Amino acid sequence: MSRRFRLGDIRSTGVAEYASTPVRADASPTTNPPPTAAPASLTSTDSHTMAPPNQLTFDLSGVIFTGSPPAWLLQYRGFEKHMVTMLMLKSGVRTYPRFDDFISALVSTMALMGIVPQTSLTDGEVILMRYANAETLPEPEETTRQWGDSPEAELANEGYGNDEIDNTPQLQAPLISGPPQTYAAAAAPPSLQQSTVPLISATPSPALSRSSSVASLTSIPACSPAPSSLPSILTMQTRPPSPSSKSHQPRVTLPERRPTRRPEHIANDEDYNRSRAGYAQGKPSHSPMYGSGRESHFEEAFFAAYPHSVDGRWHKFSASIVVLADPNEDPALLTLHSLEREEGAQETYIMRTSAAFAVARVRVMRLRPTMSVHDVHDMLAGHPVVSITGRACAYMVRHKLTDGVFSKQFRRIVMGIDPVMIRHGTQALSLFAILTDHRLDHAHTHAAMSLRLAMQFVESPLYDAQRSWLKAHAPATIHCAATSDSNADSTLSAIYRSDSTPRDQPTPGDSTISQLTASNQELQIQITALTTTNNIQARAIAELKACVRPHSTDTHHALSKYALAHTCINTQELPLLTSLLGEDTATAIQTARERAKDIAKRTLTERVAEPLRVMNASLEAELTHERAHSSELRATLAILETDLNTAARERDAHAHMITSLQSEITELRQERLTVITSERTDVALLEQRVTDAERHAVAQHQSLPLLYGSVSLELPPSPTEDELLTSVAPADLWD
């Protein structure tokens, strides 16, 4: 008897085959290929030969791990078993839940053994060869199947059934097109007519869930709804079983599935990225969604803060430009206009044109070395459009503060505060493009040269010198020409048409230098005058000393003679009183004098110290009150800051929700238009059918006679006698 496939065999071998088959590199737009893990008993023995160039396969205690490791590990291809042996000997851990956990432990162990990204390939191979033995060395293979080859060659050599089975008819094996899902159990083998019936359950198998594509894990969010319809079941002719095989192993091929964009996304990838590029250049009109209503909140925020003019007339601002700047950056080099700093604790400037018209208000927030990524996000919270200077961008790269700053859907980044200066400084835009396309750790590996060149120019003194030269030599009309429309050539046209000489309007830096130069000249004049006066006074002092010296000498001699001839009475009073009045009387007089001195001293001390004591107590009470009040104010300030951060986060969440609702409204409108068009088509078709039916009914009604006897009626001729007597053959009755 011939044996048919059993559903249990299809389920087990299908799962194993999907888990052991690596996903193609172009299956999804993600950067890293998907890791897979499955029991070794369910995978092929030559799985390491099927890995693509950017993946490695490791066999850890019968569990296969396939995925994309760090780039520097790819050079050790062929030493996978050596690395696994080293990991098992050093750590002792034999189970890992994910490929990333296994790679992390492997990299740590290799670092302990002296293998790091900077280690040469020769030294690394010498260290890994210490863990080579007869069990870990790879077996020789005559042929190596390339990645992407068809599995039909292996199917031809893999038999299933037993020696007693022969002439087995071909069956229709199910080919699944859709996400990995398990088969439902069946009581009996399916027949040929039932081979195309969907036999997929809605609950995925744990093995399939573990070996699913990374594209489905990273590109589709966890909150995305599951597919509403079951995947279709295709058919594939399988080869007849070979009598030499002892196992039943049919293959189930799962075609690739590209991830879809999130349903709440504002637009497709091309329009979304062109929109971000337009805002980065300070040109919202370059966005494909400009004026469509899908970015109305971004457009309102931009035109409310940034300088813009229409037909040469500047619009007044209603909000401030929030700009992140380097700790030592000069904001005056960010615009062709002049900046005037306002008085206050915050660093704010008023941007004025050459005609002294205020066109914007700039609030500068400085980056600090002690900041973290969370501090940067707190600074940007609540602002849908934020400016980041080129030097600030380079500073964030150096201090690793770029995660999540350039990739928020509910925020647009402008690389400066002046569209003209932004378009003439493309190095900052290049840095923005790199950080928008890649995370910083990924950019250091896959965009290293682009990042290196952009950072080198932005951090060089030539970057500031170029902006300073442009500010001094650009014509005064360039701003109105560049911001009045969306034409990219308007700026260059304004420069070519300008016949004016370089602007002599002083910049804040030039005015400061002029003031310092004038002050220096005045100080030099004062120093010269003081030096002359000092010399004159020195000569006068020398002359006076020469005149006074003889007189002072004579006075000194006279005082010396007087001191020798006279004695101070105060030093001889007690002996005099003792000799004149007696010792007891002299002692009593001295005691009374000491007592009077103490009374006078105490009285004076009390009169002076009492007001000071009262004043000190009053000041201490006031200081205690002020300290308590200051503590209350600090607590209130902390609460207000917390509420402000919470409100900012809620605003960001609401902005994200608004964006999602706008996208859903747009889709509903499109669906409504589609339904209306379809209904109109159906109505027109029904009206046409009704019209045709009415015409047909009218035509039939007109063909009927209106009066009895108005239509001639001819009877058929009567049959002849010969026709009635014609014999009928019995054989003709069966025709």
UniProtKB/Swiss-Prot annotation:
Residues 254-274 have a biased composition (Basic and acidic residues). Disulfide bonds: none annotated. Keywords: RNA-binding. The keyword Transcription regulation does not apply. Residues 38-47, 218-234 have a biased composition (Low complexity). Residues 235-247 have a biased composition (Polar residues). The keyword Zinc-finger does not apply. One of its GO terms (molecular function) is RNA binding. It comes from the Viruses. Residues 18-50, 138-170, 218-290 are annotated as: Disordered. Belongs to the aquareoviridae NS1 protein family. Non-structural protein with ssRNA-binding activity. Is probably involved in the formation of viral inclusions, where the assembly of cores and the replication of viral RNA are thought to occur. This is Non-structural protein 1.
